[in-house]
């Protein structure tokens, strides 16, 4: 094949699932083949994430416009990349990082850089007439991830007063991804009927989970147990529970307390919940700045359940290495837009995996119809994925893509939960 190079890059301002602006990017090759990507955006963000560039113009989208990021793609990144091989992902990502020149991509914006990075990979895959997961992962990419399904939303993803952000189910006994989706959907619809019977709201939050007014985190977990059982499954055997506490959102940095409680109290609360419920994964149980609290949590529960660092690590290899050295957590949440390039995302996964940490590919609360993370989860054999509830089309699109990938791979497809504490 003759050299296939980057000929043009187009970008535009579009809307995400919350109605806020984000970027669409299209990388076009000299053969006319192209790749497209839409960039997600988070509501609950880590303080060390790569910067998502916003215009800060109060006259447009309440300051959340991304026209400057669009301009950076077309006026800075295109000239820097034009003529480079569409297959040289590492070099292209390095060129964009150098063009930005900052530690957190604040000059050009991680949203601008990531859009180009993902669209480039898709253009390369399309050129070879391969699906993205096969282009990136090769012949050994055949593991379908266990989904962590966010059925009840709280925290910064809803306005219902729940302290924790996500109350999830994990269909651990499913023999396939397709069956895992079925199990999740059946529990979702059963939960809806239970909420209706109790005259609780069936409105949904940012990630498609229900957002009823509940008195406590325990009440949310009780509802999940009731839905699992009524749907015909056994809690802890067929379907386990998982939490995203997003503890940084209720952490007081001045007195280092969690809604007035100490780190030890917070660990005790989580331990008690694990004693009462079939929970096998907790994300961001302590705040990202509370290293001592994380050490206590890891010492207390690290040999019982999966402890996932999201805000703690923000998909940053340096922070992951630091956390591993200190014995913090035992799993890493992977969000490409936290770091800003596909190359750095892959490096974070490689580092975590080689050190025995599980990895979970994740969406953001502000999503689009883009299904790239489904392909990435399979490409890198993460074994787990977070992509929301069983409602809202921007969430369902990822599940539908995973179902299609499983069918494409055929008999070699393996549904594998990478959580080492799963009881299935």
UniProtKB/Swiss-Prot annotation:
GO cellular component: cell surface; extracellular region; phosphopyruvate hydratase complex
Pfam families the record matches: Enolase_C, Enolase_N
Signal peptide: none
NCBIfam families attached to this UniProt entry: eno
Family: Belongs to the enolase family.
Function per UniProt: Catalyzes the reversible conversion of 2-phosphoglycerate (2-PG) into phosphoenolpyruvate (PEP). It is essential for the degradation of carbohydrates via glycolysis.
Name by which UniProt lists this protein: Enolase
Gene for this chain: eno
């Amino acid at each position: 094949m003759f050299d296939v190079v980057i000929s043009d890059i187009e970008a535009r301002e579009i809307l995400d699932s919350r109605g806020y602006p984000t970027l669409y990017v299209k990388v076009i090759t000299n053969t006319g083949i192209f790749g497209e990507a839409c960039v997600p955006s988070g509501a609950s963000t880590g303080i060390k994430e790569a910067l998502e560039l916003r215009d800060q113009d109060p006259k447009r989208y309440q300051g959340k416009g991304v026209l400057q990021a669009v301009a950076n793609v077309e006026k800075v990144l295109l000239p820097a990349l034009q003529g480079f091989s569409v297959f040289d992902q590492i070099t292209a990502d390095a060129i964009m990082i150098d063009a930005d020149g900052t530690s957190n991509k604040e000059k050009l914006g991680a949203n601008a850089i990531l859009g180009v990075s993902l669209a480039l990979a898709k253009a390369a895959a399309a050129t070879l007439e391969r699906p993205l997961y096969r282009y990136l992962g090769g012949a050994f990419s055949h593991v379908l991830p266990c989904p962590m399904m966010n059925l009840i939303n709280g925290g910064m993803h809803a306005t219902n007063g729940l302290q924790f952000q996500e109350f999830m189910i994990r269909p651990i006994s499913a023999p396939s991804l397709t069956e895992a989706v079925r199990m999740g959907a059946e529990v979702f619809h059963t939960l809806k009927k239970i909420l209706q019977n109790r005259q609780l709201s069936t409105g949904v939050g940012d990630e498609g989970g229900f957002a009823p007014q509940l008195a406590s985190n325990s009440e949310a977990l009780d509802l999940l147990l009731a839905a699992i059982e009524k749907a015909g499954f056994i809690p802890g055997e067929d379907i386990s529970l998982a939490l995203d506490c997003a503890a940084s959102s209720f952490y007081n940095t001045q007195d280092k307390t969690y809604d007035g409680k100490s780190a030890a109290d917070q660990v005790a609360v989580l331990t008690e919940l694990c004693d009462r419920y079939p929970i096998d994964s907790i994300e961001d149980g302590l705040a990202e700045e509370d290293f001592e609290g994380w050490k206590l949590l890891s010492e207390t529960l690290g040999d019982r359940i999966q402890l996932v660092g999201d805000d703690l690590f923000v998909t940053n290899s340096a922070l992951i290495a630091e956390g591993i050295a200190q014995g913090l957590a035992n799993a890493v949440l992977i969000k490409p837009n936290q770091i800003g390039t596909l190359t750095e995302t892959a490096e974070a996964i490689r580092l975590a995996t080689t050190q025995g940490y599980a990895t979970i590919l994740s969406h953001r609360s502000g999503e689009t119809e883009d299904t790239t993370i489904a392909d990435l989860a399979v490409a890198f054999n993460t074994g787990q994925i977070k992509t929301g509830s069983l409602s809202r089309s921007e969430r369902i699109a990822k599940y539908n893509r995973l179902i299609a990938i499983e069918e494409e791979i055929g008999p070699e497809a393996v549904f594998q939960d990478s959580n080492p504490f799963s009881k299935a």
